[in-house]
């Protein structure tokens, strides 16, 4: 199971709390997923009040507040400080977005905000791209976890750049890595784990599915399968065929 900032979590599935048809379905989906962490947006969910916060606490798993919707370092830092006070945790999923069309991370502001928040005692989980230089700068800024996107948030496209994600894993073998955003199908989640990633964070794929509870269970099984596959040392892909049946012992006719 993954370890983040010295804390071991019970599942490599990290699940968001937004967009569900109802609070009851959200809670049932969390139970079906056996998620290890619940992510919460202070800005997007703040209007739900104490009932929502009580529901999150009743899930009984660690909470990872995020700064979704922030477009500047100042916004992200202010939101982070409010989240730490409300949820009583130093953990923070840091999002600083360049524009609302792509929801692409603003990597320059992201690194700056990560440095400010790390210096203030936050344990930062940065939502970033798979760019090696950016990820290196985030580690230099104090981050001990990296959360590269698979594809744009909510797109459901899966892993747009498996090569880049594989390279990131190889370059930082000892850093906890989480594929965050873009997951649409259980096969996408399994692929991330097959690449050797420590966890997967998703939300829309479950919350907006026709049956969120069934999809949550499917994601849990896929992540388990991908993790087992990675640990089994799978064969390398090759361009040419390789016979699976040995010639030894075959009858010689004629």
Curated annotation (Swiss-Prot):
Catalytic activity: [ThiS sulfur-carrier protein]-C-terminal-Gly-aminoethanethioate + 2-iminoacetate + 1-deoxy-D-xylulose 5-phosphate = [ThiS sulfur-carrier protein]-C-terminal Gly-Gly + 2-[(2R,5Z)-2-carboxy-4-methylthiazol-5(2H)-ylidene]ethyl phosphate + 2 H2O + H(+)
Subcellular location: Cytoplasm
Gene Ontology biological process: thiamine diphosphate biosynthetic process
EC number, UniProt record: 2.8.1.10
Name of the gene this protein is made from: thiG
PANTHER family xref list: THIAZOLE SYNTHASE (PTHR34266:SF2)
Keyword Plastid attached: no
Chain residues that bind 1-deoxy-D-xylulose 5-phosphate: 154, 181-182, 203-204
One Pfam family here: ThiG
Alphabetically ordered keywords of this record: Cytoplasm, Schiff base, Thiamine biosynthesis, Transferase
Family statement: Belongs to the ThiG family.
A GO molecular-function descriptor: thiazole synthase activity
Origin species: Paracoccus denitrificans (strain Pd 1222)
Active-site residues from the entry: 93
GO CC terms of this entry: cytoplasm
Assembly information from the UniProt record: Homotetramer. Forms heterodimers with either ThiH or ThiS.
Family annotation (HAMAP family): ThiG
Job of this protein: Catalyzes the rearrangement of 1-deoxy-D-xylulose 5-phosphate (DXP) to produce the thiazole phosphate moiety of thiamine. Sulfur is provided by the thiocarboxylate moiety of the carrier protein ThiS. In vitro, sulfur can be provided by H(2)S.
Protein name: Thiazole synthase
Pathway, per record: Cofactor biosynthesis; thiamine diphosphate biosynthesis
Source superkingdom: Bacteria
